[in-house]
Design a protein with these regions (language model features):
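Non-catalytic signal-transmission and effector/linker regions of two-component phosphorelay proteins
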Residues: 1-12, 19, 129-130, 136-141
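Two-component/phosphorelay signaling modules centered on CheY-like receiver
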Residues: 17-44
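Acidic, metal-coordinating helix/loop segments flanking the phosphotransfer/catalytic sites
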Residues: 25, 40-58, 65-68
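Two-component signal transduction core modules
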Residues: 59, 88, 112-113
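Short amphipathic alpha-helix used as the core "switch/output" element in two-component signaling
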Residues: 70-85
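Alpha4 helix (beta4-alpha4-beta5 surface) of REC/receiver domains from two-component response regulators
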Residues: 74, 95-112, 123
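Hydrophobic/aromatic residues positioned on beta-strands within the core alpha/beta folds
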Residues: 91-92, 115
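C-terminal output helix
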Residues: 99-100, 116-127, 138-139
Length: 141
């Protein structure tokens, strides 16, 4: 599927495991050419600092940062308040924690993708950019 090149958008990736951060960045670089990764953060503080420099169109957010599973939800709700147009896509390894997913969606996340076996695809990312809500690769309207 060819996505129009002029439909470019900027992404910040927030992920505290370096290997996963690199892997996710690679996926964007190779699979989603119209996305420009303008920054990556491994801590919440790094992320807020990045936002002062440049605002992305989408944040790819790991729910658990630095050992806290709830911090992603907090980041999400404060993004919703301060930047209502910014898309927030949650990328999480918290497979069995359904309460967390519900909290994330209630906090205004535009989508949740599980890290287990589900690769981030251009289609998913584009769906969220187009305003669909995505839970585990199934758009919900």
């Amino acid at each position: 599927m060819h996505i129009m090149e002029n439909n470019r958008f900027k992404v910040i990736i927030v992920e505290d495991v370096k290997l996963e951060l690199k892997g996710t960045e690679e996926i964007f670089r190779h699979e989603i050419p119209n996305a420009e990764v303008i920054g990556t953060a491994m801590t919440e503080n790094e992320f807020w600092e990045l936002l002062k420099v440049q605002l992305p169109d989408m944040v790819l957010l790991d729910l658990g940062l630095g050992g806290s599973t709830t911090i992603g939800v907090e980041i999400c709700s404060s993004l919703r308040k301060n930047y209502p147009d910014m898309k927030v896509l949650i990328f999480t390894g918290e497979v069995l924690n359904e309460k967390l997913w519900v909290d994330a969606l209630n906090a205004g996340a535009d989508g949740i993708i599980l890290k287990t076996g589900e690769l981030l695809t251009a289609t998913d990312v584009q769906a969220v950019m187009d305003g669909k809500r995505l839970v585990f690769n199934y758009p919900i309207l």
